[in-house]
Amino acid sequence: MPSFDVVCEANMVELKNAVEQANKEISTRFDFKGSDARVEHKDQELTLFGDDDFKLGQVKDVLLTKLAKRGVDVRFLDYQDKQKIGGDKMKQVVKIKKGVSGELSKKIVKLIKDSKIKVQGSIQGDAVRVSGAKRDDLQAVIAMLRKDVTDTPLDFNNFRD
């Protein structure tokens, strides 16, 4: 019985490459000369640093550009509040979303049941397993989920036949 998993996880290798490219551009840009602007990556979060609110926004723009070029969906990023860290310096923590939330997984299973396609959806931790008799049905479910779930980036992996 063919099946696949619906997950929500960023490509961490590409994310790391985008952060390194952003830091390289920030270090060479004229408008950041002598500033302490940078992006730090640790586990499941990024930290943006800037000399003031405007420079922090510029760092964010550079990072988003590099992420888009590397093919990392920016919907994985969850921006926290900006914080002052002494003087005029600012920082902003950006959490990286991982796993399908309980609410979203229930929504995905409900969408699958309402679609009347002959497949079953089951919640398994932070993923949703979809299994059906035909591969064509699974492809129809993937197309339907890509169309209907737009607020969260979904990946489809662990295909079994």
Swiss-Prot record:
InterPro entries, A to Z: DUF520, UPF0234-like_C, UPF0234_N, YajQ-like_sf
Function: Nucleotide-binding protein.
Provenance organism: Ralstonia nicotianae (strain ATCC BAA-1114 / GMI1000) (Ralstonia solanacearum)
CDD domains: YajQ_like
Family annotation (PANTHER family): UPF0234 PROTEIN YAJQ
Database matches in Pfam families: DUF520 (PF04461)
Record keywords, A-Z: Nucleotide-binding
Protein name: Nucleotide-binding protein RSc2549
GO MF term list: nucleotide binding
This protein's record includes keyword Metal-binding: no
Gene Ontology CC annotation, any one: cytosol
Family: Belongs to the YajQ family.
Presence of the UniProt keyword Cell division in the record: no
